Amino acid sequence: MDAYELVTRNTAEIVTEDELRALLNKPTKRVYTGYEPSGEIHLGHLVTINKLMDMKAAGFDVVVLIANLHAYLNRKGTFEQIKELADYNKACIEAVGLKGAEFVLGTDVQLTPKYQTEVLTLCQQITLNRATRSMDEVGRAMDNPMVSQMVYPVMQVVDIPTLNVDAAVGGIDQRKIHMLAREHLPTLGYKPPVCIHTPIVNGLDGEKMSSSKGNVVSVADSPEEIKKKMKKAFCPPETEGNPILQIFRYNVFPRMDTIAIRRPEKFGGDLEFHSYAELEAAYAGGKIHPMDLKAACGDALTELLADAYAYVQSYKN
């Protein structure tokens, strides 16, 4: 798999493909994703973490913004509460597999006069309506938003040149914010970033993923908890929108070469798959029972998250 295939696999959109190809030819290139400290790192985060790992393998320097100031503006707690969670999330991101990245705490770079001046300059250009729509897109629909929450997307735009990155990775829900960056950063004298958008995956019940709903698997889940969640998970005969198949596609196969489906001989014996396409075809053809697929998914996730779970236990103890 060449660098372009590695970067673009399991993506929903690349803006733009030509710009990405040109960027890949440069000897030095930087990419970032920002994570607002909030709760446990879970499979939703792992989609973009895996993409950052792909990009590191493709020759990018990877920057992770731990967006504590964004979290504060989004009313997620006091600075002290958010700082503790930021340190914890950073360690979990590393433990889940992202090694050698540069981690930047938001307040270390976002309170300078230059940064704040650029935010205020863009506030003169971006309408309130457009800022609101961009926040709605990332799942923060608000009937009565605070001014601080409207500054949030503008800050995300300024984060890109502040971190000196060439590309931004995010879920497809970040698209409107990234398009703001591509449109408005040239007015400040900066090049528009290449944007790599990943799909938004479903929760275990087939609905929108939400920690509050309990339809996610996180790094804090024990092997027993993962097994229990898999048993209850929605796994329809169809492949479209199937949360278990999505986990295999976006979380498991990017990190594991072979997946085993363990079955008694009377049910056909064990099966091995070396690609997601093989697994999906077998499931679509009725060759794998949903319970067997879910059990294999639980085993794979337990292995994949073992180091992160061990860190969580040591942190809590």
Curated annotation (Swiss-Prot):
Which of the seven top EC classes does this enzyme belong to? ligase
Q: Where is this motif: 'HIGH' region?
A: 37-45
Query: Any keyword Ligase?
Result: yes
Primary localization: cytoplasm
Q: Which GO terms describe its biological process?
A: tyrosyl-tRNA aminoacylation
Subcellular location per UniProt equals: Cytoplasm
Which UniProt keywords are present, listed alphabetically?
Aminoacyl-tRNA synthetase, ATP-binding, Cytoplasm, Ligase, Nucleotide-binding, Protein biosynthesis
Cite a GO CC annotation.
Answer: cytoplasm
Q: Which Pfam families match?
A: tRNA-synt_1b
**SUPFAM superfamilies annotated for this entry?**
Nucleotidylyl transferase
Q: Where is this motif: 'KMSKS' region?
A: 208-212
- Any idea which positions bind ATP? S211
Q: Which GO terms describe its molecular function?
A: ATP binding; tyrosine-tRNA ligase activity
Residues annotated as binding L-tyrosine are: Y32, Y152, Q156, D159, Q174
Q: Which InterPro entries match?
A: aa-tRNA-synth_I_CS, aa-tRNA-synth_Ic, Rossmann-like_a/b/a_fold, Tyr-tRNA-ligase, Tyr-tRNA-ligase_3, Tyr-tRNA-ligase_arc/euk-type, Tyr-tRNA_synthase
Q: What is its EC number?
A: 6.1.1.1
As for family, the record states: Belongs to the class-I aminoacyl-tRNA synthetase family. TyrS type 3 subfamily.
Q: What does this protein do?
A: Catalyzes the attachment of tyrosine to tRNA(Tyr) in a two-step reaction: tyrosine is first activated by ATP to form Tyr-AMP and then transferred to the acceptor end of tRNA(Tyr).
Q: What is this protein called?
A: Tyrosine--tRNA ligase
